[in-house]
Amino acid sequence: MTTILSVRLKNKVVIGGDGQATLGNTIMKSNVKKIRSLYHEKVIAGFAGGTADAFTLFEMFDKKLAMYQGQLQRAAIELAKDWRSDRMLRKLEALLAVADKKTSLIITGNGDVIQPEDDLIAIGSGGSYAQSSARALIENTHLDANQIVRKSLNIAANICIYTNHNFTIKELFSEK
């Protein structure tokens, strides 16, 4: 699996993730880019789960964003509907964390589109470690969103065997 973390704080939203791809208990690749900019760099997204499945979903999500002119929530809901109802797509195993300048969402293969109350998203095998760390840093420091994502991913990578220290981090300026 992996660790993907998104933090929205003050005027920024940041999504970061590690680069490890595993097959069973073997590391197959250490520099997979699991974080992407989509729709004219107005949306950032990360995935946890099967790499090929996630790339398929990224492509589909980018098409939905284009179809709905960058409306993140609408594109996410339409992707989730397709993902849930299409027999072939239902077999894809991945989670997406997506964000634009206003909204952060988790999209699942069950057809769920979840907007977290606190604009903090953590998915993947190291997600709970990264989320715990991020919560503590948000509540007890004055670090910015980028620093919180970096430090939290580092902590997750030190604990989770399916997460490495090869991070990709993207950010957008936020309206919140």
Swiss-Prot record:
One of its GO terms (biological process) is proteolysis involved in protein catabolic process. InterPro entries: ATP-dep_Prtase_HsIV_su, Ntn_hydrolases_N, Proteasome_sua/b, Proteasome_suB-type. Signal peptide: none annotated. Keywords: Allosteric enzyme, Cytoplasm, Hydrolase, Metal-binding, Protease, Sodium, Threonine protease. It catalyses: ATP-dependent cleavage of peptide bonds with broad specificity. It is an enzyme of class 3 (hydrolase). CDD domains: protease_HslV. Na(+) binds at residues 157, 160, 163. PROSITE patterns: PROTEASOME_BETA_2 (PS51476). It is found in: Cytoplasm. The active site is at residue 2. It comes from the Bacteria. GO terms for cellular component: HslUV protease complex; proteasome core complex. Allosterically activated by HslU binding. One of its GO terms (molecular function) is threonine-type endopeptidase activity. Its main location: cytoplasm. Pfam families: Proteasome. Its EC number is 3.4.25.2. Protease subunit of a proteasome-like degradation complex believed to be a general protein degrading machinery. Belongs to the peptidase T1B family. HslV subfamily. NCBIfam families: ATP_dep_HslV, PRK05456.1. A double ring-shaped homohexamer of HslV is capped on each side by a ring-shaped HslU homohexamer. The assembly of the HslU/HslV complex is dependent on binding of ATP. This is ATP-dependent protease subunit HslV. It comes from Buchnera aphidicola subsp. Acyrthosiphon pisum (strain APS). The lineage of its organism: Bacteria, Pseudomonadati, Pseudomonadota, Gammaproteobacteria, Enterobacterales. The gene is hslV.
